[in-house]
Amino acid sequence: MGLELIKEINQLWGPVYPYLARHIEELYGRREGTAIEIGPFAGVIFSLIEEGIGDRFVIASFPFGMGAFFIEQAKEAGATGKIEVVDTDPSLSGIEEKSVDLAVFRGAFFFPSLFDADLAAVYRVLKPGGLAFVGGGFGKYTPDSVISHLGKRSRDLNLQLGKVEISEQVLRRQIGESRIPVHAEVIDEGGLWVVIKK
């Protein structure tokens, strides 16, 4: 299933995470709460911890086999006692309803051969007043120098994993099909993202 490729992408993207965390913090607008990062492309959560954005941290890990990698990443980041790794699936089984203030799901719509993003599940786990940042890209604050440094290798790895490009129109259709009962804003600054506020 390409777990080694996914792990390489996650490590390659390390320099992006602090800038992406800044973008997320700007949208989230607070510093407390439970933060969860969903899926195989988790990593920005370590920058959220460093920046003090949130007071409880969870990685909802899938596909199976990525959890051990994230536990090792937490050790390397000195965050072992601060982060909980939960083996789950795109439906977020094992994650309680209305338990999350901030949800981040990178790579959500671009890897249909690996998983289908479940926006209804993301919405389900958000607390009232919670925010989800779902999609993909470098975020609006990542400098061009960082992007150009990892761009080609990241592109190659993504293609090997079956990455597809989707348009904003297709994304809007997917949002409609998810039947989440709130307005979801699509932003294209620094990637293609869906911002869900509950």
Regions found by a protein language model. Name each.
Residues L12-G33:
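Conserved alpha-helix/loop element of class I SAM-dependent methyltransferases that forms part
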Residues I36-E37, F41-L92:
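Class I SAM-dependent methyltransferase SAM/SAH-binding core
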Residues S91-A103:
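A short acidic, Gly/Pro-enriched loop at the edge of an enzyme's catalytic core
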Residues D101-D116:
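A short SAM/SAH-binding and catalytic strip from SAM-dependent methyltransferases
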Residues Q160-R179:
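Short alpha-helix
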Residues Q174-K198:
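Core SAM-dependent methyltransferase catalytic element
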